[in-house]
Every structure is written in C-alpha cells, then in structure tokens.
Amino acid sequence: MEKKEKSDEVIRLTDIGKSYYIGKQEVPVLTKIDLTISKGEFVSIMGPSGAGKSTLMNILGCLDRPSRGSYKLDGEEVARLGDSALAYTRNRKIGFVFQSFNLLPKLSALDNVILPMIYGNVFKKERRERALRMLDSVGLGDRAYHMPAEMSGGQRQRVAIARALINDPAIIMADEPTGNLDSKSTKEVMEIFSFLYQEGKTIILVTHENDVAAYATRHVILSDGHISKDIRGPLS
C-alpha cells in the first residue's frame, strides 16, 4: 500500500535567490526559487553539475542564507533568526547526511553519534544509551567502538545516518549520500532512507543518480539555478 503524504507544510521558499561576487561582479547561482515541501514527503533534488543543487541544500539546511527572498521553516521566517537560534534549529529540527560522511576520525562510531546530543543538553548516561540503540537500529551495534578508519564506506555512512537521527529531527537532508559507495552499500543506505520515510520523516535528497532518486516520491529538477521541473511520482 502506498504511503499517504501528509499535507502540513514544513518548508516554503518564495522568490529565493543566491549570488556570489567575484570582485564587483555578481554571479547568480539560484534565481527565483519557489518551493513548498510538506511534512512526510521524500523529495529528490536533481540537476547537472553547477545547477545549484548543493547551494539550495545549504539554504534549506540553514547552513547558508539566501541573498534575497523568503524561507519559512515550520512557519518561522529563517531570516529573523540570529546565529544562536539558527544553530539550535539546525541541531534540533534537521539531521544532515553528507557524501564525505563528515565523521570525526579520532572519535569512535559511538562518540560520533553522541556528539549532537552534547549540544542538546542530554545527560551523559542517556547519551550513551541512546547512541547505542541508534547504532543498533542501523545494523552497527557491533561496531560501536570502531574508529571510522576501521569501517567500510557503507558502515561510515550508516554511522552518519545514526548521528543525523539521534536528536529525532523531523527533517533529514542528504547531499549525495551514496556518492562514495558501491552498489551494495548504496542499496543498504537507501533502504534506511525508505524506512525513515515510511516512519514519517521528511527527507530531502540531493543526487545525480536516477536509481537513487527513484526511492523518492517527488523530484525537483534544477537547471541553471532555477527549478525546471517538479515531478510528483516516478521519474519518466
């Protein structure tokens, strides 16, 4: 049975633009982006290299601010948030998964997963218990004390997913999460995202691979910094 999408709006971008400057010359990267994402959607963001995918993801993830336009997250205007409030929003509402894993190499899998909870004021004993449960849920209960260098790419990405989930964010943002993985690990990681979608998480996935994007139920295609297509249902 197909999962019914929820209708509650979690993200609304209105006339978003982003430019960088080389000297005095403006270089537009995103232009007139209008996008609404509802709670519980699984959205892929696709497009050729240089289309603005990662820039858009950075804005959605509150890692960067747009040059113009409005971004509302859970109904709150992001531009009105100061740096501290923005950091809190990132830590509590959004879980990030990156292509390069972004694990701290001198920390064990367990300690990497614990890290976001330190900023969330979770008691030390509870941190460890929650992190162990989360690692077990992604099939890495027996790798908790391994260092990143002692794990495969697929295992490291599953640690990164566990870390992204540890504060129970409503939104998961994944930027090319399978880019460094073989086909077997790609399937394992994408099945985790599918499970999270079925559990009601909102997932936003940047990818250039059609077989990875096929796990999503909606596909936003970027071209030259603007949305050229917004496809609901399978990719044609």
Question: Would you name each region that the model predicts?
Answer:
Residues 9-222:
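ABC family nucleotide-binding domain
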Residues 1-19, 229-236:
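ABC-family P-loop ATPase nucleotide-binding domain
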Residues 219-231:
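H-loop (His-switch) and adjacent beta-strand-loop-beta switch element
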